[in-house]
C-alpha cells in the first residue's frame, strides 16, 4: 500500500521523503511566481528524492513543473502549451473538455490549459485529438496534461454537464499510477 503524505513548503524537512514512493503535483493555479514562492525552496529535496529512485506524477501545472524551468526532471523533453500547437482543437485557456484517446479508448477529459510534450524519448499513454501526447511516462516521471482527478463540481457549467465522467477518470488515474509508476495493482487514490 502506498504511503500518502500531504505537504506544504513549511512541512518539508530532512527525511520527509524517506518513506515516500511517489510525489504528486496535481493541477491547479500556478505559474512561475507560484513555483518560486512555494516550491523552489524544496527543489533540492524533490530532486534528491528523484535521484534516490522516487517517482513523480504531475497533472496539468504539476506536469509543467517537471520541465527544465522548474524541477528539471525530463531528459530531452519539453512541456509546451497544448493550445499553442498549430493543430490543437482547443485554442484558449478556459475550463473545457478535450477529446483524448487513453490506452486506445476515446474520452472527453477536463482540460484547463494543460501541456503536451515534445522531443526526447517517452512512452505515450494518451493523446489529444490531434495526436499530440497528453499523458506520458519517462522513466520514473508520469505526466498528464488533462485532469483525470477532476471532481463533479468542475462540470457545473451547463455546457460541461454532459461530460462528467462519473469517476471513471479517477479509476484511469489510479491505474496509470499503479501500472506505470508504482508497478502495483494495489493503488486506490479515490
Which ranges hold each PLM region?
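Extracellular ligand-binding/catalytic regions of CAZymes and related secreted enzymes
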Residues: 47, 148-190
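A short, well-structured beta->alpha microelement
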Residues: 1-16
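Catalytic beta-strand/loop cores that center a nucleophilic Ser/Cys/Thr
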Residues: 91-154
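Alpha-helix C-terminal capping/helix-to-coil transition sites in glycosyltransferase folds
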Residues: 18-19, 52
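Structural motif
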Residues: 21-28, 57, 141-145
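A glycine-rich, often tryptophan-bearing local segment used as a flexible ligand/cofactor-contacting loop or short
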Residues: 31, 35-100
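Conserved beta-strand scaffold positions in the cores of enzyme catalytic domains, especially
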Residues: 3-6, 56, 124, 141-143
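Short, basic, glycine/proline-bearing loop/turn elements
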Residues: 23-33, 156-163
Amino acid at each position: 500500500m502506498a504511503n500518502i503524505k500531504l505537504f506544504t513548503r513549511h512541512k518539508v524537512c530532512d527525511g520527509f521523503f524517506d518513506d515516500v514512493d511517489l510525489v504528486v503535483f496535481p493541477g491547479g493555479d500556478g505559474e512561475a511566481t507560484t513555483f518560486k514562492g512555494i516550491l523552489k525552496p524544496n527543489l533540492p529535496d524533490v530532486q534528491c528524492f528523484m535521484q534516490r529512485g522516487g517517482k513523480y506524477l504531475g497533472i496539468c501545472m504539476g506536469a509543467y513543473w517537471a520541465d527544465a524551468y522548474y524541477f528539471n526532471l525530463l531528459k530531452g523533453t519539453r512541456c509546451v502549451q497544448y493550445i499553442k500547437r498549430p493543430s490543437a482543437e482547443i485554442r484558449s485557456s478556459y475550463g473545457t473538455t478535450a477529446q483524448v484517446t487513453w490506452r486506445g479508448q476515446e474520452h472527453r477529459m477536463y482540460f484547463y490549459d494543460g501541456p503536451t510534450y515534445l522531443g526526447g524519448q517517452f512512452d505515450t499513454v494518451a493523446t489529444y485529438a490531434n495526436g499530440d501526447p497528453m499523458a506520458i511516462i519517462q522513466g520514473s516521471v508520469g505526466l498528464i496534461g488533462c485532469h483525470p482527478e477532476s471532481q463533479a463540481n468542475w462540470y457545473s457549467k451547463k455546457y460541461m454537464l454532459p461530460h462528467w465522467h462519473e469517476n471513471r477518470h479517477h479509476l484511469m488515474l489510479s491505474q496509470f499510477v499503479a501500472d506505470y509508476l508504482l508497478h502495483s495493482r494495489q493503488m486506490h487514490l479515490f
